[in-house]
Regions:
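One-carbon transfer enzymes
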Residues: 1-232, 241, 279-282, 288, ...
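C-terminal active-site/capping subdomain that shapes the small-molecule cofactor and substrate pocket
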Residues: 222-312
Length: 312
């Protein structure tokens, strides 16, 4: 089929590569504009753009799409059979949704209708879900409300991070998109309404990343650390210094006295243990202020933490 592909991060790049390798004719690739990144604020291309450049595909990088008559007319002129949308990062106007013969097909990182919205993978991990998956769907003007086509489910390991689940789902999403295009092409693709029992996955707020030792229990803190790894990480302050937590585990214990956030043990042999509500946080990977992330044993060899000190 003749395809216009819209996507931006590595999650989308996996799908673009799969569609390309399946032999479809990719008429154009639409991705976000290059953005400044890092200390030098150097302009960086998206993973989707990098792949498109490597394969000499036509690239569009509109700053906005809504009311962008020139861009919309150019896509109309290309006359795609279908538009594939994977983690593009912008809401598409009705004019785009109606351009192609088969409409716009989306790869969404959840088992719809659960976790509609911008951050489905992150919220599944943040909430401690034991399963998630990928859904392909026909797009409509709502927020991930279109009829579903295919689904595939996976388990979320108790220690898996958002980054690890993201990587798994990107590969599953790529495979499902190719299968979806095949079914659309031969006329066997189903249209399954989502129903009304849905949940939302809004964009993440940076304020979420500070650990609330008093109001979150140990399991919730672990899920927070998992869910925000590697996007932003979670943090707390110790003696006025910002400490980031990248991996932790939980030891269940409801009988500890003392304030939550208090250091119970800290040495390079045994590690770092912090009192939390309904349990103990065992730190596995950590990052000091203005330092690199490292395992807790290496961190404690160069940084002394006093027993009884408190994370705030």
């Amino acid at each position: 089929m003749k395809i216009v592909f819209m996507g931006t991060p590595d999650f989308a790049k996996e799908s673009l590569e799969a569609v390309y390798n399946a032999g479809h004719e990719i008429l154009a690739v639409v991705t976000n504009p290059d953005r400044p990144k890092g200390r030098g604020m150097k302009l960086v291309s998206s993973p989707v753009k990098e792949f498109a450049l490597d394969k000499n595909l036509k690239i569009y990088q509109p700053e906005k799409i809504k009311n962008n008559v020139k861009f919309i007319d150019e896509i109309k002129g290309i006359q795609p059979d279908v538009i594939c949308v994977v983690a593009y990062g912008k809401i598409l106007p009705k004019e785009i949704l109606e351009i192609s013969k088969y409409g716009c097909i989306n790869v969404h990182g959840s088992l719809l209708p659960q976790y509609r919205g911008a951050a489905p993978i992150q919220w599944a991990v943040l909430n401690g879900d034991k399963k998630t998956g990928v859904t392909t769907m026909y797009m409509d003007t709502g927020m991930d409300t279109g009829d579903m086509i295919l689904k595939e489910e996976i388990e979320i390991g108790k220690d898996e991070t958002t980054g690890e689940v993201w990587e798994k789902l990107s590969k599953i999403g790529a495979k499902l998109l190719v299968e979806t295009l095949q079914q659309i092409g031969n006329g066997t693709a189903p249209r399954i309404p989502q129903g009304t029992d849905f949940s939302m996955a809004p964009m993440l707020d940076k304020e979420m990343s500070k650990i609330d030792w008093n109001n979150k229990n140990a399991n919730q803190i672990k899920n927070l650390v998992r869910g925000l790894n590697p996007i932003m990480g979670t943090y707390s302050y110790l003696d006025g210094k910002k400490i980031k937590f990248w991996r932790v585990d939980v030891i269940q214990d409801n009988n500890l006295d003392g304030e939550n956030g208090t250091v119970l043990r800290a040495d390079s042999r045994d590690g770092l243990y912090i009192k939390a509500k309904n349990g103990i946080i065992k730190v596995i990977e950590i990052q000091g202020e203005n330092a690199k992330k490292m395992n807790i044993q290496d961190f404690l060899r160069g940084n002394k933490i006093e027993i009884g000190s408190k994370f705030e």
